[in-house]
Amino acid sequence: MKVLLDTTFILPTLGIEVSEEVEDGIRKLGEIEAEIYYSRFSILESIWIAIRLMKKRSFDVERFDQGLGSIMKSGRYIELEETYRVFKEALRFYMLGHRDMIDNILYAASINLGLKLLTVDSELREFIRSKGLKDTLISPDQISDENSG
């Protein structure tokens, strides 16, 4: 299975707490030995989250740095190469009413690159359903060996 991680799913590696559902999804990906993709735009969004946490003084910079190195240098995660088509499609989703451009880029990339987008984002899921768009989304409870083919 080839899976693109929504930003929420890279946060634990960066030392940022997430829900048990997200932790479970990451564990399942490891069990089925999925090909795991990430976007530089998720790294940017993670930095925004880190900045918010820094302001609250509940942030471990060293852990974030180690996690960032793990994501970008370990070879376990594959960096996306977004294309012109991905950005064009992301803008189309914005014009259709979905205002989160990071989500739009990730969703467009999943379509154009043939990846499943692992997310717990119900707003994105509802947008895709309401517009009759191709559903590439997968939630943690949908990860299994049967899907890894």
Predicted region positions:
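Short amphipathic alpha-helical segments and helix-helix/interface helices
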Residues: 23-27, 68-69, 106-107, 125
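Active-site neighborhoods of divalent-metal-dependent phosphate/nucleic-acid chemistry enzymes
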Residues: 77-120
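Acidic, PIN/NYN-like endoribonuclease modules and their adjacent C-terminal/linker elements
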Residues: 78, 108-149
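Short, well-structured N-terminal submotif of metal-dependent ribonuclease cores
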Residues: 1-38, 53-65, 145-147
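Structured helix-beta-strand junction loops
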Residues: 32-33, 74, 113
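Alpha-helix capping/helix-boundary segments
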Residues: 9, 42-43, 85-86, 106, ...
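ABC-type ATPase nucleotide-binding domain
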Residues: 49-50
